[in-house]
């Protein structure tokens, strides 16, 4: 249940205020559907077991007037769990209200020490201590509500019910009813039920919020790198319908702890379905913000030197033996240098045909001369527009170049006699080698970054990346994220 409730909120992050209302302003939207909750609910038992085991069971003391014995004082001390198992659980979404989880046949054996005392008719004080076991069978009903608290998800289970089908007291391992057992069972059972309900429900609520913080902290880490982070705080309370959970996030990129507080676009719930397990909706504004921080952080540049430059040319099938190549590089291709960098922040837009990137770049070629004392530099300034479609398969990101346009702006260091041929040659190099190489490196960089954050540990099934005018949609199915649950349970110990 807790896994089904909180692991779904893996985008939730930093602390900011939540707005109220029915409009959904967001840069990023996460929707998790009923089929996903059923998958996550598979491991409910492990989290519930942690709640039972972590709960603090206080000593139970009391006094009871009993026939023949008079006033009997008693106490159950050092109550602990010696055995616990869970038969099954079910999860349901209640429209605009809660996530309801029913847990059936929780078999729990408690153990501890029973101390009791009384005064006989002859004035003799009797004090006894005996070990006990309590064999119980319990059903739980937990209705969890999700709210936004200062930009973070909070969970609350105001409705938490325990139904006891069995509550048997065994003293010192004896299974046959004894007179002490008969005397104590009835009036201890009622008190014990109240204590167990209070402590277990309290611990379930505590663990659910610990898990919420755990997942949100992990999400913030996944979506950060160096000085770049993402403000994924909630813009309002999560939405619960009969078929999905949905959360809305700001999606501002943060650079060196500074982010722009721009107006957020309005999200329409009709843009997402409920046939896949998990949906992410990214507004075009998110990619604009990404381009800005990447440019500010100096990440939009590439430098190739010597043998690496020659190897790249050969990788893309560029003929390095042609005469003009030898002429341009001065006979020393292993000493050539090429640098590429953006002159200003790229513009990124989402369209039906793909993600369109408009960038102004400078490409500089530096080739040594035969005396190796001098070099010749050729510099190109160009506007490049590329249309890209992304896909994810076998734990790798793939970028497909659908279309590109290059508009030359300025060219320097070309003599009149060589300008046309050299410019054509270098332009061909940019087209046939430069753009594919940049795409290939972006694939590798993004894949390595995602894997370093643990994305490769997730069992992502049939992911689809779909672009539409103004937004990008990511939809997928998945297997249970066992590694996240293991990490969380270890953090509790």
Curated annotation (Swiss-Prot):
InterPro entries, A to Z: Bactericidal_perm-incr_a/b_dom, Cholesteryl_ester_transfer, Lipid-bd_serum_glycop_C, Lipid-bd_serum_glycop_CS, Lipid-bd_serum_glycop_N
Induction pattern: Up-regulated by high-fat, high-cholesterol diet.
Disulphide-bridged cysteine pairs: 160-201
Tissue: Probably primarily expressed in liver and adipose tissues. Detected in adrenal gland, mesenteric fat, spleen and aorta.
Chief place of localization: secreted
One Pfam family hit: LBP_BPI_CETP
Domain of life of the source: Eukaryota
GO molecular function: cholesterol binding; cholesterol transfer activity; phosphatidylcholine binding; phospholipid transporter activity; triglyceride binding
One GO-annotated biological process of the protein: triglyceride homeostasis
Keyword Chloroplast: no
Secretion signal span: 1-17
Glycan-bearing residues: 59, 105, 257, 358, 413
Keyword Lipid metabolism: yes
Catalytic activity: cholesteryl (9Z-octadecenoate)(in) = cholesteryl (9Z-octadecenoate)(out); 1,2,3-tri-(9Z-octadecenoyl)-glycerol(in) = 1,2,3-tri-(9Z-octadecenoyl)-glycerol(out); cholesteryl (9Z,12Z)-octadecadienoate(in) = cholesteryl (9Z,12Z)-octadecadienoate(out)
Single GO cellular component term: extracellular space
Record localization: Secreted
Keywords tagged on the record: Cholesterol metabolism, Disulfide bond, Glycoprotein, Lipid metabolism, Lipid transport, Secreted, Signal, Steroid metabolism, Sterol metabolism, Transport
Family the UniProt entry places it in: Belongs to the BPI/LBP/Plunc superfamily. BPI/LBP family.
Function: Involved in the transfer of neutral lipids, including cholesteryl ester and triglyceride, among lipoprotein particles. Allows the net movement of cholesteryl ester from high density lipoproteins/HDL to triglyceride-rich very low density lipoproteins/VLDL, and the equimolar transport of triglyceride from VLDL to HDL. Regulates the reverse cholesterol transport, by which excess cholesterol is removed from peripheral tissues and returned to the liver for elimination.
Protein name (database record): Cholesteryl ester transfer protein
Organism: Macaca fascicularis
């Amino acid at each position: 249940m807790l896994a089904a409730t909180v692991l779904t909120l893996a985008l939730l992050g930093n602390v900011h205020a939540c707005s109220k209302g029915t409009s959904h302003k967001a840069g990023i939207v996460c929707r998790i559907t009923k089929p996903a909750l059923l998958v996550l609910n598979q491991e409910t038992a492990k989290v519930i077991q942690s709640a039972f085991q972590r709960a603090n069971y206080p000593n139970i003391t009391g006094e009871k007037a009993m026939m023949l014995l008079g006033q009997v004082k008693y106490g159950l001390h050092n109550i602990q769990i010696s055995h616990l198992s869970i038969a099954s659980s079910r999860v349901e979404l209640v429209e605009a209200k809660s996530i309801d989880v029913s847990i059936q046949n929780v078999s729990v054996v408690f153990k501890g020490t029973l101390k009791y005392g009384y005064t006989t008719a002859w004035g003799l004080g009797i004090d006894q201590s005996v070990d006990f076991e309590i064999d119980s069978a319990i059903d739980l009903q937990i209705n969890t509500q999700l709210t936004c608290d200062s930009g973070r998800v909070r969970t609350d289970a105001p409705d938490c019910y325990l139904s006891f089908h069995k509550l048997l007291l065994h003293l010192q391992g004896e299974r046959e009813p004894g007179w002490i057992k008969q005397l104590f069972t009835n009036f201890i059972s009622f008190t014990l039920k109240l204590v167990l309900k209070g402590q277990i429900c309290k611990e379930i609520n505590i663990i659910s919020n610990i898990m919420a913080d755990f997942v949100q902290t992990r999400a913030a880490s996944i979506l950060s790198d160096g000085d770049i982070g993402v403000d994924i705080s909630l813009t309002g309370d999560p939405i619960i319908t009969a078929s999905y959970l949905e959360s809305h996030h700001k999606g501002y990129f943060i650079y060196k702890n500074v982010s722009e507080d721009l107006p957020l676009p309005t999200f329409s719930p009709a843009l997402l379905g409920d046939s896949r397990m998990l949906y992410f909706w990214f507004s075009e504004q998110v990619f604009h913000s990404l381009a800005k921080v990447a440019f500010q952080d100096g990440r939009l540049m590439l430098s190739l030197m010597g043998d690496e430059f020659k190897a790249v040319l050969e990788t893309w099938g560029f003929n390095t033996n042609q005469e003009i190549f030898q002429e341009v590089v001065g006979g020393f291709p292993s000493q050539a240098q090429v640098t590429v960098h953006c002159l200003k922040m790229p513009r990124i837009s989402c369209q039906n045909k793909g993600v369109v990137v408009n960038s102004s770049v400078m490409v500089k070629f530096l080739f040594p001369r035969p005396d190796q004392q001098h070099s010749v530099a050729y510099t190109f300034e160009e506007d490049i527009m590329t249309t890209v479609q992304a896909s994810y398969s076998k734990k790798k990101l793939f970028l497909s170049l659908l279309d590109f346009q290059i508009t030359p702006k300025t060219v320097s260091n070309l003599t009149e006699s060589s300008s046309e041929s050299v410019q054509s040659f270098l332009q061909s190099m940019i087209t046939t080698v430069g753009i594919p190489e940049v795409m290939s490196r972006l694939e590798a960089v993004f894949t390595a970054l995602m894997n370093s954050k643990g994305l490769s540990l997730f069992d992502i099934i049939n992911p689809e990346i779909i672009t539409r005018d103004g937004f990008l949609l990511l939809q997928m199915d998945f297997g249970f994220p066992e590694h996240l649950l293991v990490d969380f349970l270890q953090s509790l110990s």
